A protein has these predicted regions:
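Short regulatory helix/loop adjacent to the ATP-binding pocket of P-loop NTPases
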Residues: 27-31, 86-104
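Conserved alpha/beta core segments of nucleic-acid transaction machinery
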Residues: 163-192
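C-terminal helical "lid" of AAA+/P-loop NTPase domains
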Residues: 123-127, 138-146, 152-167, 182
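Structural recognition of the conserved hydrophobic beta-strand(s) that form the central parallel beta-sheet
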Residues: 16-17, 49-51, 79-85
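Conserved AAA+ ATPase "sensor/coupling" helix adjacent to the nucleotide-binding pocket
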Residues: 86, 97, 105, 117-132, ...
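Conserved alpha-helical scaffold flanking the Walker A/P-loop in AAA+ ATPase domains
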Residues: 8, 25-50, 56, 60-72, ...
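Conserved AAA+ ATPase "SRH/arginine-finger" region at the nucleotide-binding site
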Residues: 74, 90-92, 105-117
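Walker A/P-loop
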Residues: 1-15
Length: 192
């Protein structure tokens, strides 16, 4: 969504924030009496992307501030996109006024990516400098055929594989299905 917004308008101000970072920003700003600066920062967005909004449940002060930021962005016709692991109406300890606001927008349930897409995601993410694993297409397909839920689980499998490879001092270019089975034994059931 952020890339598309920049293509449409290269001058767009796009802010992405994982919810727990937002909560930390709010908590710190309240402690240092700089809440207005933080609100102005988020209100300056043309597009605000918030990951894991469900984690705001039970965080009363963060909900209060998010409500005001949301209203400002909505009233100025800015866009807000957030991810959530459930429909907003099902989030316990979420203020009703936020449930109402969240339900006014377009709510989509995203299906897990198909096998080929999961393999492509694994290949792309394995090239990230923090992971830096040399996966063959066959190995990526093998992992993707066993890790079917979501991108986070794919990333988790890659991180677990990297830790195993590093700990076992296996050459990063020699990652085979057997190595994957050793690393991801709880996810990968070897064929008998």
């Amino acid at each position: 969504a952020g890339h598309l917004a920049l293509i449409k308008n290269p001058n767009s101000k796009i802010i992405y924030v994982p919810l727990m970072d937002f909560v930390r920003n709010i908590t710190t700003s309240l402690r240092h009496n700089t809440i207005e600066n933080v609100k102005l920062f988020y209100q300056s967005a043309d597009l605000l992307l918030v990951d894991d909004i469900h984690l705001i449940a039970g965080k009363d002060k963060s909900q209060e501030e998010f409500f005001h930021i949301f209203n400002f962005l909505f009233s100025t016709k800015k866009q807000i996109i957030f991810t959530c692991d459930q429909p907003p109406k099902n989030i316990k300890d979420l203020e009703n006024r936020l449930k109402t606001r969240f339900s006014q927008g377009l709510n989509l349930q995203l299906s897990p990516p198909e096998l080929e897409m999961r393999a492509a995601i694994l290949l792309k993410k394995s090239q990230n400098p923090q992971i830096s694993l040399n996966l063959s297409e066959d190995v990526a397909l093998f992992i993707a055929s066993h890790v079917m839920s979501n991108v986070r689980d794919l990333e988790g499998a890659l991180l677990k594989l990297k830790a195993f490879v590093d700990f076992s001092q296996i050459d990063h270019s020699l990652i085979t299905k057997d190595v994957v089975e050793g690393a991801l034994g709880d996810l990968i059931k070897p064929k008998k």
